[in-house]
Amino acid sequence: MYKKAYGTIETLAPLHVGATAGEESGNLNLIFRDQFTLTGIIPGSSLRGRLRAEMRQNPELGEAEANYWYGDAAGSAHSEVNNESIVKIEHASIVWLPVFSPGQPIVWVTCERLLKRYNRITQKKLTIPDPYTGSSILKPRQSQNKKTLFFNLGFLTVNKMENLSAWFPDGQELPAVVVKDEDISMIHDMALYRQSRVRLKSIPVNEMLKLPLEQ
């Protein structure tokens, strides 16, 4: 009988999980996404591969132990044999997404659907905040009796503020806001870390040796 457990991943640097270098065309951002919110997810296979690599590098455990817990790697001699992994890992989805906002400088954004999923997995049975609810330590701009946040694509109005610390895994409240499900995909794409790629022209070594040297 399997035992269920959940974990929380905190990314300390921009994370890209999607197409590899040979599968992209131009600067398309081909990432794995949740089909409802269109926000990024980490496939369970990627998490299992990372955990397998960590275990394989441990001298006290090694390759055999990694294959026992996570199954044989694709392409290995035993990959075609029914060697099912002991540990089953589902995909990881976003709970809070950091978004740049002048004056904050970071606002953590989520939506109702993502919080409902977090509520279901953790079995905390918390009350889902209403859309456009800000955390109690958020510092929105006051203008015409309205509280607003500024993002790159425009302003967002905060209707009310309350303590959201129960929704953060470590229990520490951060500047945050809950938005509608239909708004999170646009904010998500705005907050993505984009990195352009440049490919230099390849020159054979024999031709490179013929190039004139600058004096």
Residue ranges and their predicted role:
Residues 1-215:
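Basic, Gly/Ser/Thr-rich N-terminal segments that form RNA-phosphate-binding interfaces in CRISPR RAMP
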